[in-house]
Amino acid sequence: LRFDKAQMTNLQESLYKEMLITNRSGAYCSTTLVGCNIRKYDGLLVIPVPELDDENHVLLSSLDETVIQHGAEFNLGLHKYQGENYSPKGHKYIVSFEWEQVPTWTYRVGGVLLRKELSFDTSIHRIYVRYTLLDAHSETQLRLRPFLAFRSVRQWTHENGVANRSYNEVENGIRMCLYQGYPDLYMQTSKPTDWHYCPDWYRGMDYPKERERGYN
């Protein structure tokens, strides 16, 4: 399976090409090939939480990457907001998408060529995101911004004062739990990394497949 740059950057075509990865623990990852969630069931890490109910729950909605070179930032993420607004339009940097063994994206930002691979642990609630810098003409940094949800796939989350915004440091990362009854979400890297804690709410996200089903 392969799609080229022309196919990936045309949202009329690529936005509704969806992917699903599952494992034996009951966890799954569901999104579009351009990484823009279009259903409330979508998420990078969705798991059952039997301590709460019989539903699946979105812990990690998405993970935005930003390539930084010479002080300039290039965000590779893509989200749809109300009113047909898309931001930050990172799909325009996709050179190709391939799926042989695992889903693989290749991005080009100026002189930077970056590969991203996605895979699941087969037996536990764990997803791996692997980045490989294939080419760079100068010093390059990669910043990751996780979007947390901690909600049932059947519900919406809105800004509130109940969410626990604190975190605990773990090896090469942090762990967080937004609401009582949920398991901790561990976010770790394979090497020591600088973590900058700056929590914020993102408002007005739009899921077009839900509107088609009659949900606001």
Where are the regions a protein language model picked out?
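Terminal accessory carbohydrate-recognition/targeting modules of carbohydrate-active enzymes
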Residues: 1-216
